């Protein structure tokens, strides 16, 4: 079975099994709609069964495009002991195997069934099948590229009365959640279930077939039917063996006449075999051509075949009934003579036959009642008919043919169990072969009956004149040939119509496939565009981060400049202090020594205090410097980490696509495999305590997976929808159990902590700046104090040296900061280069996408043109071929009709000739009245009864022996008729050969139209001829009954020709309608593409309008008029917000 993308298929299968006594009809309906698979089987005359299989799965059947195989096998052993059937073992094996590019699914089940034998109230054997010991094994196997699932289940029931059921299950998962920490998992369950009980009342629901009760299992029914057929075949073989002995005795009696009959029959059969071999070769050649298109036209051909078969069977029955009645009337006279001669021998034969048949009836079963009725009818029928032997022989042949066909079908079914597609084709071929064989047998019977009538007519040479019978037989043969040609024309017409339908279906399918491919490619392009947009957004985020970092670097530069300015201020202040110190030194040199000593003491004391204070302040400044250095180190580390993160993000962009695909596949596996999850959930017992946690798959958190614990060792993951269906009473604490919510809460807490820490750091920085300002104030105050107290130069020089050292350190740090800034600038330039490269790559991708779109459009246009041209050419060729074929066949039929009209005109004669023949008859009858005896009169009456279609007056004409002059006239007339007929036949043959040579050259439409006009003119001429014949009363036909038949057949031929012309007109109308549909489709496609082009222009124009400008009233009209989707509107609004 092939599942198309439309996910809709309805297929019906009809099988017919025929037996000597009854017929069995089997209907099999298969229907698929969406995700439901239904299979219905009905068998008439045995039992009625409705077997429904519902496979409800989200996306399982919609993905099955490659292969599906259902296998159903039964294994049984049958023994025959004392006319009873004992079934030792019956195994039911059911297997479903689904294979696809993405998914594979396999289901196997085995069960053993045993039989319980009881006795009926009346004592008749009653076979009731019960599942007393049921060993059931199931295997599930499902895997795809990401995960594998295997389940082995065993169900053993030993005692139905104790109601104990023991089941065991082994489950194994590999890479189920597609996580790093969960690679495989296996569980095993062993439990007993007392609720699973098989009631005997339910098990005894059975169907009655010929005295047997059979349980509702297909395998048991099929085995019993096969056994029944085998028994029937054995009985028929025994009957044939008994009958053979009788037939040998009867053959010795009838050897004289049968030898003649066999010689005639052998010649006919040889001719029939030669014709059959030619037809089989032609059939095989045609079959090889048709097998390729068989799958596409299967449903149409089956329906056509059934209709044709029903029509043929009805025609065959009507023809056969007429021929059989005619044959029986002809043979009735011979049979009476034959019975008078051999009555004694037949009576002996009847006595022997009755004894043997009584023994045979004691052997038969109750099931073969119909066979007994047939045999009894044959025994009780009067043996006066010598035709009993031939009827029995035909029945035997039909039985053998049925058995051979049945054996062939069974062999083919056993050989083709594995491939269901080959089985279907094989069955259809066998059905066709069976129909051909049945048709061949029917033709054999027709040939035999026709030969018997001809032999009977040839044996009556002394009574009927030869020349009249020859004309009649030739006319009959020609009529049969015309019938065959008409039937062949019908068949060819049906075949051509089916081929034309198949061709149109193939073209439609190819166009649909191309459309689907184009849609898939457009969706892929949209996916790539979305990915590019996401990457552009990520790049914009990176650019914003880099800009923020640039701003931070500029702020650090500003801080450094401020620090440099402060240092320069300190240097200027120190220089000013030095100058002041020099002034103090000069003043001291001019002052007195005493003053100096006193002042030195005071200065020393002050300097000690100041030195202590300065030492404390210097230590505090050194601590602050260390803090600043630590902050610089932290900033360096932060920058390095940010650079690493940026590089990792660039590398992760490529890996995210692969992980996203794997995640999507895994999600689809977990959500799509509902049947697998349902099988697990049906066997679980869950309490609210066993629910561990939930895991959301969608962003909106609508689709959840529930993790369940059972027996502390087994864990299961089930979709939320299946959990709610199977356990509606249980409540899930979704707010506290969803893992994503927990992690999101933790992330929020961490973010809050980080924000608090940043806030604290900012406060600390502000406090440090405040302290620094206070420190500045203190330093100024101290400097003012030192201006009055610095008098010791040596100490001040040491301080100056220390300050110079500190300055050198600051300069070194400044150089280091400058080097770091240079490195950061280089990295920034590299990032800019990478951004430029990515932009170039994006531009190249956009160019490539635009080129792909253009190529797609070109390919679409080219493919549509190609297929249109091919379709128009092929349709025109086929139409021309059809017209030529029908025109040529019409010409042939018209020629044959003209021949028949010519013959009918020659078979008639005028009223003058009729009056002459009547006078001669009166004279002849007056002379011969005294000579005729009573026996002769009786014989003539019998012979007149045999000749059904000939009237009494015309019979006298045929029995009359005319004078020599009249005989010469008649012979002359007959010879002229024969010569005309031969000349006409030769002309027709020559004409046909010329037509066959000119078929290939005359293909133009003008010539076909001329042929049609000529055919119409010929038909009108034929009608006028017939009217003229009807209007004139001068000619009277010799054989009015046959003349009426021929006239009716000619009228039917004219009706058929008119019907064929009407069929041609209908064909042309259908072709024109198909062309109009193609044109409409092209116009619709062009309008759709134009609308999409306008839509893209409007969307780009609206996206360029910034969000500040309010244009909602105008834009909403455009959105509603062009049917913009919500996603497209959101994308346009995003672009507007950016601008």
From Swiss-Prot:
Provide the GRIP domain boundaries: 1084-1135
Any keyword Metal-binding? no
Record's keyword terms, sorted = Coiled coil, Merozoite
Recorded protein name is GRIP and coiled-coil domain-containing protein
- List the source organism: Plasmodium falciparum (isolate 3D7)
How does biotechnology exploit this protein, per its UniProt record? Possible candidate for an effective malaria vaccine as determined by epitope response in sera.
Biased composition, Polar residues: where in the chain? Answer: 369-380
User: Upper lineage ranks?
Assistant: Eukaryota, Sar, Alveolata, Apicomplexa, Aconoidasida
State the signal peptide span. Answer: none
- Coiled-coil intervals, chain numbering: 472-648, 758-877, 1043-1084
Region Disordered, residue ranges: 366-388, 1004-1024
Give the compositionally biased regions (Low complexity).
1009-1022
């Amino acid at each position: 079975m092939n599942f198309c993308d439309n996910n809709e298929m309805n297929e019906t299968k009809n099988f017919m099994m025929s037996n000597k006594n009854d017929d069995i009809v089997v209907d099999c309906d298969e229907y698929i709609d969406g995700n439901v698979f239904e299979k219905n089987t009905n068998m008439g005359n045995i039992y009625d069964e409705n077997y429904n299989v519902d496979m409800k799965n989200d996306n399982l059947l919609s993905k099955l495009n490659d292969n599906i195989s259902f296998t159903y096998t039964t294994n049984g052993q049958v023994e025959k002991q004392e006319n009873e059937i004992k079934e030792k073992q019956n195994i039911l094996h059911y297997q479903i195997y689904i294979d696809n590019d993405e998914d594979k699914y396999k289901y196997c089940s085995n069960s053993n069934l045993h039989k319980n034998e009881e006795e009926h109230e009346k004592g008749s054997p009653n076979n009731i099948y019960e599942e007393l010991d049921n060993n059931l094994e199931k295997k599930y196997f499902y895997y795809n590229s990401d995960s594998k699932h295997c389940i082995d289940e065993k169900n053993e029931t030993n005692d139905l009365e104790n109601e104990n059921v023991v089941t065991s299950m082994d489950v194994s998962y590999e890479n189920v959640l597609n996580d790093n920490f969960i690679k495989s998992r296996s569980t095993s369950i062993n439990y007993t279930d007392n609720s699973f009980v098989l009631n005997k009342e339910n098990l005894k629901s059975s169907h009655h077939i010929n005295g047997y009760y059979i349980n509702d299992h297909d395998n048991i029914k099929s085995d019993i039917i096969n056994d029944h057929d085998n028994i029937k075949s054995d009985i028929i073989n025994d009957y044939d063996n008994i009958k053979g002995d009788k037939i040998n005795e009867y053959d010795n009696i009838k050897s004289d006449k049968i030898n003649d009959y066999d010689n005639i029959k052998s010649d006919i059969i040889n001719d029939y075999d030669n014709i059959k071999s030619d037809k089989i070769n032609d059939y095989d050649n045609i079959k090889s051509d048709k097998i390729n298109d068989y799958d596409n036209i299967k449903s149409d051909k089956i329906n056509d075949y059934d209709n044709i078969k029903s029509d043929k069977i009805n025609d065959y029955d009507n023809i056969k009934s007429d021929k059989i009645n005619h044959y029986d009337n002809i043979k009735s006279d011979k049979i009476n003579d034959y019975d008078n001669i051999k009555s004694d021998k037949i009576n002996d034969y009847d006595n022997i036959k009755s004894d043997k048949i009584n023994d045979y009836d004691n052997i038969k079963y109750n099931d073969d009642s119909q066979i007994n009725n047939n045999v009894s009818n044959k025994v009780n029928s009067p043996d006066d008919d010598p035709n009993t032997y031939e009827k029995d022989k035909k029945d035997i042949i039909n039985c053998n043919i049925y058995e051979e066909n049945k054996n062939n079908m069974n062999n083919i079914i056993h050989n083709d169990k594995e491939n269901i597609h080959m089985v279907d084709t094989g069955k259809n071929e066998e059905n066709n072969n069976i129909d051909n064989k049945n048709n061949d047998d029917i033709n054999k019977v027709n040939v035999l009956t026709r030969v018997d009538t001809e032999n009977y007519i040839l044996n009556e040479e002394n009574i009927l004149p030869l020349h009249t019978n020859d004309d009649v037989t030739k006319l009959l043969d020609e009529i049969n040939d015309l019938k065959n040609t008409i039937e062949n024309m019908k068949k060819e017409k049906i075949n051509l119509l089916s081929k034309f339908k198949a061709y149109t279906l193939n073209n439609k399918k190819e166009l649909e496939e191309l459309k689907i491919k184009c849609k898939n490619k457009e969706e892929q392009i949209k996916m790539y565009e979305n990915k590019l947009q996401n990457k552009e957004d990520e790049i914009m985020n990176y650019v914003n981060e880099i800009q923020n970092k640039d701003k931070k670097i500029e702020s650090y530069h500003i801080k450094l400049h401020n620090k440099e300015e402060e240092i320069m201020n300190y240097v200027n202040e120190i220089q000013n202090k030095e100058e002041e110190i020099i002034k103090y030194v000069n003043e001291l040199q001019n002052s007195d020594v005493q003053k100096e000593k006193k002042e030195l003491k005071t200065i020393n004391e002050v300097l000690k205090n100041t030195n202590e204070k300065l030492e404390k302040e210097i230590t505090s400044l050194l601590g602050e410097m260390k803090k600043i250095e630590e902050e610089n180190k932290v900033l360096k580390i932060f920058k390095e980490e940010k650079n690493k993160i940026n590089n990792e993000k660039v590398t992760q962009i490529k890996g995210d696509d692969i992980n996203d695909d794997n995640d999507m596949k895994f999600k689809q596996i977990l959500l799509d495999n509902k049947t697998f999850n349902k099988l697990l959930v049906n066997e679980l017992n869950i309490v609210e305590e066993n629910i561990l946690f939930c895991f959301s798959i969608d962003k909106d958190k609508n689709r959840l997976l529930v993790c369940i614990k059972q027996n502390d060792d087994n864990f299961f993951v089930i979709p939320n929808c299946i959990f709610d269906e199977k356990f509606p009473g249980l409540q899930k604490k979704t707010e506290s159990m969803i893992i994503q919510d927990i992690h999101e809460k933790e992330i929020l807490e961490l973010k809050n902590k980080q924000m608090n820490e940043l806030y604290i750091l900012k406060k600390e920085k502000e406090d440090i700046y405040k302290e620094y300002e206070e420190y500045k104030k203190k330093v100024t105050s101290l400097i003012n104090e030192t201006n009055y107290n610095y008098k010791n130069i040596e100490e001040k020089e040491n301080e100056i040296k220390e300050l110079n050292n500190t300055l050198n350190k600051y300069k070194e740090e400044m150089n280091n900061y400058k080097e770091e800034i240079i490195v950061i600038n280089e990295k920034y330039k590299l990032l800019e280069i990478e951004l430029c490269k990515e932009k170039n790559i994006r531009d190249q991708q956009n160019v490539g996408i635009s080129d792909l779109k253009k190529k797609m459009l070109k390919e679409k246009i080219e493919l549509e043109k190609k297929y249109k041209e091919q379709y128009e050419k092929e349709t025109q060729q086929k139409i021309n071929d059809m017209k030529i074929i029908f025109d040529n066949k019409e010409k042939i039929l018209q020629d044959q009709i003209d021949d028949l009209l010519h013959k009918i005109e020659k078979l008639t004669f005028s009223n003058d000739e009729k009056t002459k023949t009547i006078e001669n008859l009166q004279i002849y009858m007056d002379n011969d009245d005294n000579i005729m005896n009573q026996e002769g009169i009786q014989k003539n009456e019998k012979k007149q009864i045999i000749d059904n279609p000939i009237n009494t007056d015309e019979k006298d004409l045929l029995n009359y022996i005319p004078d020599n002059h009249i005989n010469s006239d008649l012979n002359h007339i007959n010879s002229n008729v024969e010569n005309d007929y031969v000349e006409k036949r030769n002309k027709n043959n020559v004409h046909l050969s010329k037509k066959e040579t000119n078929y290939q050259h005359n293909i133009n439409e003008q010539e076909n139209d001329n042929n049609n006009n000529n055919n119409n003119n010929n038909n009108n001429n034929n009608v006028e001829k017939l009217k003229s014949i009807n209007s004139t009363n001068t000619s009277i036909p010799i054989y009015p009954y046959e003349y009426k038949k021929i006239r009716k057949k000619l009228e039917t031929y004219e009706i058929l020709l008119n019907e064929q012309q009407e069929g041609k007109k209908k064909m042309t109308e259908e072709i024109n309608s198909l062309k109009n549909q193609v044109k409409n489709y092209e116009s619709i496609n062009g309008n759709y593409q134009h609308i999409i082009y306008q839509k893209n222009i409007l969307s780009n124009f609206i996206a360029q309008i910034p969000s500040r400008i309010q244009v909602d009233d105008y834009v909403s009209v455009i959105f509603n008029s062009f049917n913009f989707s919500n996603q497209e509107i959101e994308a346009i609004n995003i672009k507007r917000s950016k601008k």
